[in-house]
Amino acid sequence: MNRLKIGVLGAGHLGKIHLRCIQQANERFDLVGFFDADTANAAKIAGELNIKAFDSAESLIEAVEVIDIVTPTIHHFSLAKAAILRGRHVFIEKPLTHTVAEAEELLALTRQQGVKVQVGHVERFNPAFLSLGDISINPMFVEGHRLATFNPRGTDVSVILDLMIHDIDLVLHLVNSEVKDIHASGVAVISASPDIANARIEFENGCVANLTASRMSLKQMRKIRFFQRDAYLSLDFLEKNAQIIRLLDKNTEGGDLMEMDTARGKKWIDITMPEPLAVNAIQLELETFASSIVHNTTPKVTIEDGYRALKVAHQIIEVIGDTTLS
C-alpha cells in the first residue's frame, strides 16, 4: 500500500493520541508534521515525539495529501474547508462541525472536489462493536448510557455534542428508518450548556432509542443495549466486550441450552460473548480511512453519517432549549 503523506491539525490531548497512532501506522502513513496554535505546546510535542511542528495550518495543508483535524470543534469548518478546497482528503474528529449549516457546506464541497472525508465516530471501531461481526441487528428499542466524570476539557460544546453524539451515530447507523420525533431534557450543572441530558428518539418504523449522557458522574459508563425480535445485544464500550442473547426455534447449537415457553411457542436461549478483537480503535479508524483513499472505496464513517448525527444532535439541543433546568 502506498504511504500517504499526512499532517495533524491540533496537538491537544486527543491530537497527541492521533499523532502516536499515526506513528504506529507507519506502513499506511508518512507523518509529515503537525500544527498547534499553542506554540509552547507545539515545541514540547515536537521534541517529545520527534515530529516537525509547522508554523501554520496553511503550510501543513500544502505539504500533505491527508489532513487529520483534531482541534476544538469551533475550528473544524474553516480548517476542513481550506483542506478540501486544496484537494486534500480529510479525517475530522466528531462532531463534524459546530453548526448544521457548516456541515451542509462541507458536504457540498466534498462532493464538488471529489475527496474522501471520514468523521471520527470511533465507537464504530470499538472491539465491542466489531465483535458483533455479521450478526443481523434490527433493533426496535435501544437503551444507551454514556457517563463520564467531569473534566473541563470538552466543555466548549454541550454534552450532546461531546458524548451523546457517539450513540446517536450508532443508532442512526443501525436503525434503517427516518427519525419521526424527538423528546429531550437536560440540566446545566456547571457548564453554560447541559452537562446531563436524556433524549428519546422515535423512528418511523416504530423503533425507540432512549439515550442518556452525563459528564457529571462519579463513575464512567459507556453501555448500549439493543432489543429486537428474538434477540438482546448488550455492548460495553468501556470494557470492550459484548453479550448476545438469542431465542432460537431449535437447539441447533448442540449445546445445553435453556428451554423456555414464550408467547410464540417453545424457544431455546443461546448466550454468546464474542471474543473481542485486540485493536486500537483510533489507529484502526485511521488505517481504515487510508485504505479507502488508496483503494478508492467509501469511508466507513462518511461525511453524510457525520452530518446526520450532527443534525439529530442539534435537534435534541433545540428541544432541550425549551426544557433545560439551570
Please report, for each region that a protein language model flagged, where it lies by residue.
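N-terminal Rossmann-like dinucleotide-binding module
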Residues: 1-48, 171
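Beta-loop-alpha module in the N-terminal Rossmann-like domain of NAD(P)-dependent dehydrogenases
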Residues: 18, 49-107
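A short helix->loop->beta-strand "cap" motif at the edges of active sites that frequently abuts
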Residues: 51, 86-88, 113-116, 207
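C-terminal helix-rich "cap/oligomerization" subdomain common to oxidoreductases
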Residues: 59, 66-69, 288-326
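A contiguous active-site-proximal alpha/beta segment in oxidoreductase catalytic domains
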Residues: 97-154
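Mid-domain beta-loop-alpha active-site segment that forms a flexible
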Residues: 120-127, 150-179, 194-195, 306
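C-terminal glycine/acidic-rich active-site capping loop/insertion
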Residues: 122, 230-300, 326
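Contiguous beta-strand/loop segments that form the cofactor/metal-binding neighborhood of enzyme cores
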Residues: 168-243, 276-295
